[in-house]
A protein has these predicted regions:
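Structural recognition of the beta-strand scaffold that forms the well-ordered cores
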Residues: 24-28, 35, 55-58, 79-81, ...
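Active-site-proximal N-terminal segment of extracellular/periplasmic enzymes that hydrolyze or transfer
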Residues: 4-54
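Short, structured active-site-proximal loop/turn typified by the sulfatase FGly-forming signature C/S-X-P-X-R
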Residues: 35-72, 83, 120
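Active-site His/acidic residue clusters
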Residues: 134-137, 149-151, 177-224
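Metal-dependent active-site segment of extracytoplasmic phospho-/sulfohydrolases and closely related
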Residues: 25-26, 44-45, 217-259, 295
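Substrate-binding rim/cap in mid-to-C-terminal beta-strand-loop elements of soluble/periplasmic
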Residues: 75-77, 81-84, 259-303, 317
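Catalytic-site neighborhoods of secreted/periplasmic enzymes
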Residues: 87, 91-163
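Active-site rim elements
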Residues: 92-97, 209-212, 277-286, 304-305
Length: 319
């Protein structure tokens, strides 16, 4: 395959950063509407944004067009992971999923590099690895993750005293602890952390005090991850970390218990980052599919021309 090299547009003043080893951590906290994350106190996300920026973005493709995509979780993840909408990646629900692996996910691109790129996945939903990214499947590229923490939600021996929502919360905590430990000790070049608790509370209770509490709780998990990155950066000053925190969909306006449609609140998400280079919302709107090319640019990945041509988004990093 012919290659596309993503040029680094930074000036000579940034040469020291260019010479550092790029690292990326992206975190998906499930089902938090933009209006909620903007209203509730979130010191963890605020700490990330203090170094970079926050902006609203959208999911769901273009209304009434072939790219229109359901605003549900697996669809949001796959749109981020592949930089495409449902009409390409073929994920339209959380179950009965048959991804189109012709559209490379970001970890497949990472493993396609001439240099060794280590990868990590820390997830409360095992299907992210086994189905969405087709872990080890030849059709999906055949790659395996170097660091994995998942499967707890399927293990009956894990937190058996808890039921349903509280058990998933315990899984989120375990996933965060292991992710933070791995970041600090091993620092995979590209890592994804997925946490579910907020969506569970949204479905159960909708908008209100319990959702606000869940957001504050999951923000504390973000703070744990951010603290690990900060500690790692102080120890290894040659690493250049991009941290992105986002969500996969919004919620209905009626009571916040549902999602999946094309209302403004369901389509509106947000992107928080530690990068001061993120484009201003005044310059252009952002979408979840823009995260993929943003990571590609920061990591200085080469992509096959065919893969680059399939992307729906564009990098959010400015000159």
């Amino acid at each position: 395959m012919s290659q596309v090299t993503v040029a680094d547009p930074r000036s000579a003043d940034d040469v020291l950063e260019v010479n550092k080893t790029p690292k990326t951590l992206f975190v998906v906290v499930d089902g938090i509407p933009a209006d909620v994350i903007e209203r509730v106190s979130t010191p963890g996300i605020d700490a990330v944004v203090a170094r970079g920026s926050y902006q609203r973005a959208y999911v769901g493709g273009d209304r009434g067009m072939p790219t229109e995509s359901p605003t549900v979780s697996a669809v949001g993840y796959m749109s981020l992971l592949t930089g495409t909408w449902s009409n390409k990646h073929n994920v339209r629900a959380n179950y009965g999923i048959e991804p189109n692996y012709d559209f490379w996910d970001i970890f497949r691109v990472a493993k396609h590099q001439a240099r060794a790129v280590s990868t990590g996945l820390f997830s409360t939903w095992t299907d992210n690895r086994t189905i969405l990214m087709g872990d080890g499947l030849e059709a999906a590229g055949g790659y395996k993750f170097d660091f994995v923490a998942d499967g707890f939600e399927k293990d009956p021996a894990f937190a058996p005293a808890f039921e349903n929502v509280e058990r998933i919360q315990a899984v989120d905590l375990q996933v965060t602890t292991l992710a933070a430990k791995t970041i600090l000790e091993s620092a995979p070049d590209l890592s994804w952390v997925y946490l579910q608790h907020t969506d569970d509370i949204g479905h159960r209770d909708g908008d209100g005090p319990s959702m606000d509490l869940a957001v504050r709780w999951i923000d504390a998990r973000v703070l744990e991850l951010w603290a690990a990155v900060q500690a790692r950066s102080q120890q290894f000053v040659n690493e250049d970390w991009l941290v992105i925190v986002t969500t996969d969909h919004g919620r209905t306006s009626l009571n916040g218990k549902g999602h999946g449609g094309q209302s403004d609140r369901e389509r509106t998400i947000w992107i928080a980052s530690n990068s001061p280079r993120m484009v201003s919302p005044a310059d252009r709107s952002a979408a979840i599919v823009d995260i993929y090319p943003t990571i590609v640019e920061h990591m200085r990945f080469d992509m096959p021309e065919e893969v680059a041509a399939q992307l729906e988004g564009q990098s959010l990093l400015s000159m």
